[in-house]
Amino acid sequence: RMADPAGDPVWPGRSQSKRMNIMDRGHYNCGKGPHFPGSYEFADDVMFFHLQGSTQYDALGHVWYDDQIWNGYSADTTIGSLAKASVAPLGEKGMVGRGILIDMARHRGKEVLDAGETFNHEDLMAAARAQGVTINKRDILIIRTGWIGSFYKRDPEEFYKDFIEPGLTYSPELVSWFQEMEIPNIVTDTIANEVTVDPVSGVALPLHNALMRNLGITLTEIAQLDPLADDCAADQQWTFL
């Protein structure tokens, strides 16, 4: 959902989605509504929002370093619009594969992971074993932390205070594991898909470059996974197409 009067979970610094009527009965009441033959009248609205203000794929050209985005393209190709590495191919063809839900919050006995709480590939495999499933090559990896669901259960000021999300944390071993497993897509119920600031290096969001820019792994962010996780737990079925 977007433009919720109570607010939506967005990255700090991005404005909330805004919806407004540009035509409704009020315009007709004050004589400003357009008239058509017969008794036809109408209401219309418009929305203003960040394209990363709801559930979405990060384009592979979303981040870069050393003046190069994914596949060696120049960062200059992002000027004005993404001439390379946009989400257009995903929009045209989609992505289909075996999905596997790893419920890290449930595995750790929590409703939601703590702010800044981390996990790595070994933790993912341990959680999978506890669920009785195996992460296979080329799986679409869906990871629940409970973080987005918690937004709707507490005051937004509390959610954003000292903002640091839980999530995957960088290591060379983790990046090698993702490469060896040929994971095409990571989906999480967080805004940025990884811990906000790496606790070892102090670098912000290092996996965005390590996984997207270097390996071409797509990231899906701000997914509401609580209903899916509850259904999977009830059925003890954690994989799906």
Where in the sequence are the language-model features?
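Active-/binding-site microenvironments in catalytic and ligand-binding cores
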Residues: R1-L241
